[in-house]
């Protein structure tokens, strides 16, 4: 990509995107997590829309923007609930209060909702959309419009696994909401089955790797549903490294065949 006219802009966006993800992984305050979550969505959108003169790229960026906004909306709802119920944004203080809220209900209109279950639904919905789970996976194959280094970041080592990392970070909460674990198992199983079956019928090599990523993230979410958080975190790191190298290799292959991605 040394011949690209805006190579400096790409390098700036890649560094900002990676910094946002690192910030998300190390912060232990819900407000900072929300801030990093928004930054990840913003910079991923700018990376997908890097070739902004292409019609298909603009459509892919719009699709990414819509799903990113939905994910951010559920994250913001969870943040507001944490302020109203926990009266703090520090995760360590929130986790200490969770056992005492096992029978706490909130009222929305004339309906009573179990607070921990509703709170966990907001979190897994936000993380599931970002992790391209079933019904929210459609933005990920189109995100291949980004340059290959950005695709390696978005698809493997940062963006999609950020949703899984969010679920692992709030794993204490899911120990008190058993039905949420069932939802994670169901969604993860559907995603890994759909991603692997759909990938078999792909002729585009980049989309084949994209659906492979969707399938592997389904494995991770399903493992979170079984409360195997240590194993999921280990597999997350291994998958991120291997898939990042695979994307770079695919990009080199496409470049070798003069941009042809049809297998």
Mark where each language-model region is:
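Short phosphate-coordinating micro-motif centered on Lys-Gly-acidic
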Residues: 38
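Hydrophobic transmembrane alpha-helices and their helix-loop junctions in integral membrane proteins
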Residues: 1-33, 42-263
